[in-house]
Amino acid sequence: MSRPARWSLLAGLPLGIVASALLWAALGPLAPASREEVFEIPKGTWARRMAGDKVEILPNNVRLVLGVKDVLVLRNRDDVPQIFGPTLMMPGQSFRLPFQVASTYQFACTAHASGQMTVTVEPGPSAGWERLAWRTRAFMGPGGTT
C-alpha cells in the first residue's frame, strides 16, 4: 500500500468511527438496565407533615418513556400506610405500576404535599432521526449541557 493511500485510510478512520456511532445511536435498540423508575417514601414523612413541615419527597410530575422507563415503583418506608391511586401501601410495602399506553395520568397520593401526583408517559422514540435526537437530549441532560 502506498504512503498516500495509508494516510487516506488513517484520515478516514475517525470519520468512520463517528459515522458508526451515529448510526448505532439512530438505529440501535433501546435496552435500559432497568425499566423501573423508583421512588421511596422515607420513614417519618407522615410525622413531619403532621408537624407542619412541607415535605417534598415526590415530584409533581413523573415522566416515563414507553420501552425505556415505563414502570413506576413506589416504596413505603414510612411508619404509616400511604395511598397511591386505588392502592393502600402498608409500611414496608412496594407498589409496582407498569404503563403500556402513552398518556397523562392523575393519581391521589397521600405522600405528596398536594395530595396528587401526575405521571406523564411518553411514547418511545422510533428508530432513525427521532431516536438519535432522543438519545442526544438524554445525553445532554435537562439543561442541554452535560
State the predicted function of each range.
Residues 2-146:
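Extracytoplasmic copper-binding redox domains, predominantly the cupredoxin/blue-copper superfamily
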